[in-house]
Structure formats: structure tokens, C-alpha cells
Amino acid sequence: MSQANASPTTTPLTRELIVQNKMGIHARPAAMIVRITNKFRAEVLVEKDEEQVNGKSIMGLMMLAAGKGAKVRFIATGADATALLTELEALFARKFDEV
């Protein structure tokens, strides 16, 4: 199927977000990401450098070793992909609620 004819549910949406919190994506931020991604039916992959993991896996996210300043790309596919990415953008903007 060509990109022009692809439906919104099958066309992957991407967002590149920058980790801004001091400690990066450790266990608590990874759990916060997974809490959001599991609220949605969309499939979500997360990329850092050349590594790609399931966005619904705490261990996968922690294995990315995304420290402060790291660029992380989220790729979501599904009817609710836009809402999922919007919530993730807000979480990153709040620096995972870390002080």
C-alpha cells in the first residue's frame, strides 16, 4: 500500500523526544512510560541510536540506557497512536515529574 493511500491506523507516527531529567530513563521513568503506553491499543516501538525496543516493556526501555540529553524516537501504530504520543510528549516535558 502506498503512503498516500495508507490509513491512519496503519501508518506509523513518530515523535523524537529528548530526555531532560537528570537521571535519564531509569526504572521509575520507564514504568511511567509503560503505564502510558499500556493505556492504549497502539503498538509502540522506541529507538535510541541503532537499538529498538518494545515501548510497553520496562526492561526494554531501561536497556536503552537513555541518559540526560539522549534523543529517543517513539514509533506508534494504531487508531489511538496520536493520543499515545501526545501523552508521552507531556511526560517528557514534565521531566518525568522529577524535582
For each feature predicted by the language model, list its residue ranges.
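Short amphipathic
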Residues: 10-21
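Glycine-rich, flexible loop/turn motifs
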Residues: 19-21, 49, 60, 92-95
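Amphipathic, hydrophobic secondary-structure cores in small proteins
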Residues: 25-27, 31-82
